[in-house]
Amino acid sequence: MVSTLPIAYTSELGVLGKKKIELQTNGIIVPPDLVEDLEKNWNAPAIRRGRFVICLESQDDKKLTTVLIINGKFAVNSPYHMIKNGSNYEIWKNDAKYTDIVLMPHPKFYEKVTRDGVPMYEVAVLGEPNHLRSVLNQRCAHHVCGKPCKFCAIENWWAGHPNKTPAQIAETAEAAYQEGIIHHVTLSTGTKASPGKGLEDIVESARLISRKIPVSTTVNFEPMTDYVLLESLLREAKESGATTALCNIECFDSNIREVIMPVKGKLAIDVYDKVWERCLNIFGENEVYTMIITGIGETDESILKGVEFAASRGVVASVVPHTPMIGATYEAMIPPSTERMLYLFEAALPIYEKYGLKLYGGTGGIYTSLKGM
């Protein structure tokens, strides 16, 4: 059903949105001396693995757009590089300044350890301002059986503790909250060989967090066909402070789904539809999200039809560029062009408007950047 809610999007993505995608699809070269500086003084715990977060500040309202940079092999040819100019940090394109950037300070909790001796920076990290993120299990069952999703390198995301416990997650979240730097938590996991595929641990983590601190939580999980178990776990998550659900389909193109996702791709799109329906029944409108990856062999038509399919159900489908990670099967691929991404964004925005969806509306903190996608 088409919504009549008064939601409107500009057809113009804005300067920051365009800069964001330009930097993501090219990568940013960071010289060795700045790698050490960022790791020590700023929020960059995974920079030696090519992953770090910068922010672009609006000159109009000073709001920040978060940019996740993944420097895969493709980034060695990037025209963009970071420099330090006095106390400020800048991105230059070749020999000319491109933009100022804002970095998040190095959190104090990164220097702490959990009660069982695990460094907290190995348990959870700041993914953007006010937002803590953790991946409970970084040993995905699909990787273990030799059938990983070809775009994924979950084991290399950051030097995290490979199998984090809910107690460690809750303790780390409490430390970050007491520092005054988080309002949201996103919990995800590599697939586990369990009935709930790891969602059980996410729910337990949310439950323990809710006992300690008042934050909103996003649960990010793999779909399952045991819908009775799914509903039970999601309702428990909701009761434990989870406000937003993220179940990523990654690709709508039926011609390549099983090629790029040998296990996940066997799940029919109809399964995702049924999972999203249950998420919507529990979490409500504008609280259910999915992600579509661009640049893994799919067609533009499949992406835009996928955005429409999801939106017609009440699900926000975020279109993101494939920035190939080192360690993934597809690590040697090249990201999609900036022009292609901008075209897809421009084409997707009216679809969200048509169905009254808020691209950045999840109260769990997911996609809280106000410009760009």
Residues covered by each model-derived region:
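Core AdoMet radical
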Residues: 153-171, 176-233, 237-275, 289, ...
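Conserved strand-turn element in the central/C-terminal portion of the radical SAM core barrel
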Residues: 216-228, 276-301, 320-327
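Catalytic cores of alpha/beta
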Residues: 228-239, 294-312, 370-371
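Short acidic/His/Gly/Ser-rich catalytic and metal-binding motifs that mark active-site loops
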Residues: 143-144, 253-257, 326-329
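Short loop/turn motifs at secondary-structure junctions
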Residues: 148, 181, 241, 284, ...
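N-terminal [4Fe-4S]-dependent radical SAM core
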Residues: 61-150, 155-159, 365-367
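Auxiliary Fe-S-binding modules of radical SAM enzymes
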Residues: 1-92, 278, 282, 301-373
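Residue-level recognition of short, structured coil/turn motifs
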Residues: 214-215, 262, 284, 353-356
